[in-house]
Amino acid sequence: MRAIDLNSDLGESFGAWSMGDDAAMLDIVTSANVACGFHAGDPAGILRTLKAAAAKNVTIGAHVSYPDKVGFGRRNMDVASDELTADVIYQIGSLQGLAKAAGTSVRYVKPHGALYNTIAHDRRQAMAVIEAIRAIDPALVLVALAGSTLIELARSEGLQCIAEAFADRAYTPQGTLVSRREPGAVLHDPELVAQRMLRLVQSGSIEAIDGSLVRIEADSICVHGDSPAAVEMARELRRVLEQASTSLQPFAGKRS
């Protein structure tokens, strides 16, 4: 039986500003990418999300970002390597402290937004993130875009790295994500999304935006928690995968 992880970006509300339905998503996903305060989230809200995740036995990951709350972490930044390393260490460490208080622990790191996309191809910034993880906890798993050069780079530097696919994003024929600035980049139909991901899990391929089939090898599937139909989409995806006898389990298990 093929096993796959379902993850979502959570803990992104800030003060009076609400983002997503964390409680509902935690009933569906197996891993939670929790904001660390740089692109979204505040300490009290992050702690609430961590406690809720612990109660549901959902695995926790640090959703690290560029320091960009105004742009929700989606603006490219040319950050110096030492600054980026320090920023990532700071975010992981902060989340580790809150997670301990919530009775859980951080098991992996998934960069957010522009940082995620940049380190998929930018070796300098990728190494800065890798150095941060090695410095604070080399046992943390790094989540990377399926097909990116980051996967082999991280593994060559001694980290465990897993590949991720996106349920609600369109793909180019080259296997990269279609830019959010392009029409059709974000998918909203729960049934369509679920069938696309079922094909991915069963055959290792996905239909690109031009109709061609692209090979994608992934250990985890992300459903963005901030999309309008996020909960409905995640629920339908889980239903379809379970109906097809797919085992849903976190890629980063508990440490012995």
Swiss-Prot record:
UniProt keyword annotation of Glycoprotein present: no
GO BP term, example: carbohydrate metabolic process
Enzyme class: hydrolase
Alphabetical list of InterPro entries matching this protein: Glyco_hydro/deAcase_b/a-brl (IPR011330), LamB/YcsF/PxpA-like (IPR005501)
GO molecular function, one term: ATP binding
Catalytic activity of the protein: 5-oxo-L-proline + ATP + 2 H2O = L-glutamate + ADP + phosphate + H(+)
EC numbers on record: 3.5.2.9
Keyword Nuclease listed: no
Superkingdom classification of source: Bacteria
Keyword tags: ATP-binding, Hydrolase, Nucleotide-binding
Protein task: Catalyzes the cleavage of 5-oxoproline to form L-glutamate coupled to the hydrolysis of ATP to ADP and inorganic phosphate.
Subunit structure as annotated in this protein's UniProt entry: Forms a complex composed of PxpA, PxpB and PxpC.
Family affiliation: Belongs to the LamB/PxpA family.
PANTHER family named in the record: 5-OXOPROLINASE SUBUNIT A, UNCHARACTERIZED PROTEIN YBGL-RELATED
Protein name as catalogued: 5-oxoprolinase subunit A 3
Gene behind this protein: pxpA3
